[in-house]
């Protein structure tokens, strides 16, 4: 390797492909009890992210949903996917520090219950981003490889 090649290699930006919970907290405004992503385990800039949520019996929603058979509410599964989508959006050029609001869901289905002890793996893909204002994404959540939920999500930027 020549000196020039070494210098160019050092100048190439390092593409981040994972995010810790601390890094996610720097990107998203959500806090307990509404921070629903523990880690981003795979990230392709401008395209997709895979996040995980460790579902424990200590989640604040389990005592009321449902007392004798704790289930993670479907709306929180969708919110978890939306937060993974939020990580994708915050990493787009010019979007750092912007606030993205969840603007809608379509074609959402729940396929299996999510219960304490499950690890929810959420894959979210960016389908479109129009005029740097409206984003559309496709998400799915799996537990042990089984589809738990899927749907399309819309986001809007608030300045």
Curated annotation (Swiss-Prot):
One GO CC annotation: cytoplasm
Give GO terms: molecular function aspect only. Answer: (3R)-hydroxyacyl-[acyl-carrier-protein] dehydratase activity
The record's HAMAP family line, in alphabetical order, gives: FabZ
The disulfide bridges present are none
Listed under GO biological process in this entry are: fatty acid biosynthetic process; lipid A biosynthetic process
Lipid biosynthesis recorded as keyword? yes
Annotated function: Involved in unsaturated fatty acids biosynthesis. Catalyzes the dehydration of short chain beta-hydroxyacyl-ACPs and long chain saturated and unsaturated beta-hydroxyacyl-ACPs.
Which InterPro entries does this entry report, sorted A to Z? FabA_FabZ (IPR013114), FabZ (IPR010084), HotDog_dom_sf (IPR029069)
**Active-site annotation:** 65
Q: Which Pfam families match?
A: FabA
Q: What class of enzyme is it?
A: lyase
Q: What is its main location?
A: cytoplasm
Family of the protein in this entry: Belongs to the thioester dehydratase family. FabZ subfamily.
Q: Where in the cell is it found?
A: Cytoplasm
The residues that cross the membrane are: none
Protein name in the entry: 3-hydroxyacyl-[acyl-carrier-protein] dehydratase FabZ
List its EC numbers: 4.2.1.59
- Which reaction equation describes what this protein catalyses? a (3R)-hydroxyacyl-[ACP] = a (2E)-enoyl-[ACP] + H2O
Lineage of the organism: Bacteria, Bacillati, Cyanobacteriota, Cyanophyceae, Oscillatoriophycideae
Organism for this UniProt entry: Microcystis aeruginosa (strain NIES-843 / IAM M-2473)
Q: Which UniProt keywords apply?
A: Cytoplasm, Lipid A biosynthesis, Lipid biosynthesis, Lipid metabolism, Lyase
């Amino acid at each position: 390797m020549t000196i020039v090649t070494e210098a160019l290699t050092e100048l190439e930006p390092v593409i981040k492909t994972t995010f810790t919970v601390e890094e996610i907290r720097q990107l998203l405004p959500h806090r307990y009890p509404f921070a629903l992503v523990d880690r981003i385990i795979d990230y392709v800039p401008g395209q997709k992210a895979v996040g995980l949520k460790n579902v424990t019996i200590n989640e604040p929603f389990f005592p009321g949903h449902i007392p004798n058979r704790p289930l993670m509410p479907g709306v929180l599964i969708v919110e978890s996917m939306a937060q993974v989508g939020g990580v994708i959006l915050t990493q787009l050029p010019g979007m750092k520090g912007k606030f993205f609001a969840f603007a809608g869901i379509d074609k959402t289905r729940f396929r299996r219950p999510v219960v304490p002890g499950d690890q929810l793996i959420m894959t979210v893909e960016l389908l479109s981003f129009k005029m740097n204002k409206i984003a559309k994404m496709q998400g799915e959540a799996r537990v042990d490889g089984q589809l738990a939920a899927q749907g399309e999500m819309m986001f809007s930027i608030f300045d």
